[in-house]
Amino acid sequence: ISLQFTTTAGFVCLAGCVLLMRDRVSSRWLGVLWVVIAALIRFMAAGLVGLLMAPIIVYVLRLNWRRYIPIVVMLMLIVGCRAFNRYVYERDSEWRYYREYNQLRAQLNDNPNAYRLQPSQLPAEVDWIDYQLLLRFIPDPEQIDLKAIRQLSATVGSVPLHEQFSNLQRMEKYAVEIAILLALLVLMILTTGNKTKFLFLIGYALFVAVLVVHVSMDGFLKNRVFICMLLPLLVTDFMLLPNTTGLKRRWGIGV
């Protein structure tokens, strides 16, 4: 696996979430540190893993409110780091321009709806050839500036909902990845004999399905995103499968 920023943040956030469920207090606070670091590496990847881990964390912690204190502190730290980051870098106009330009450009490149636009749908300031160069990751910043990128982003965001649902047809390219996700969910559902766990897994499966559909409506299900979705499922599978050995489950060194 190529440990680029997205995948690295996913692994680090996963380790932190697992530690948050441990009984030892020091382990939970170490988990806070890992999740905060993951959010600093790649916020969206950490958020995706955290979102998928949230149901199992709540399932394990139940109504033990004291164990939620590290999680509350963790969320406050993440919000504080994001606010500090914005405060420091937003004061530099060149950096602010660069960050917003490339953020919007990346969103357009990753959005299948951007490839549906016809020449007549483009803003008047954007030439069709320049737009095609933008979609091929070689934009001309003099021809498509931040103002044009904003207009294109708004245009792509206004694509009708029924056209966004048609993007689900593209998911056939990821048939293997989706089959793995479904197999894990079916395995978890079939191997549990506990009614509470069964209902939880049904709800969790629906939650994952809705999330996959949501991601696919305005983005490509890339391998790095798939890995970030697969990791929490593996952990959930490990935690909820029946343990008939009587031995304490071990996560590995430090976990």
Predicted region positions:
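Transmembrane alpha-helix segments characteristic
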Residues: 30, 195-215
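Membrane-proximal stem/loop segments at transmembrane-domain junctions that anchor or position
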Residues: 89-166
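Signature aromatic-anchored transmembrane alpha helix within multi-pass, membrane-resident enzymes
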Residues: 69-76, 244-255
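Membrane-interface alpha helices of multi-pass inner-membrane proteins
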Residues: 28-43, 53-54, 73-83
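Hydrophobic/aromatic-rich transmembrane helices and adjacent perimembrane loops
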Residues: 47, 51, 219-242
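Perimembrane helix-loop-helix junctions
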Residues: 48-76
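Membrane-interface transmembrane helices that cradle and orient dolichyl/undecaprenyl
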Residues: 13-27
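Hydrophobic, aromatic-rich transmembrane alpha-helices
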Residues: 166-197
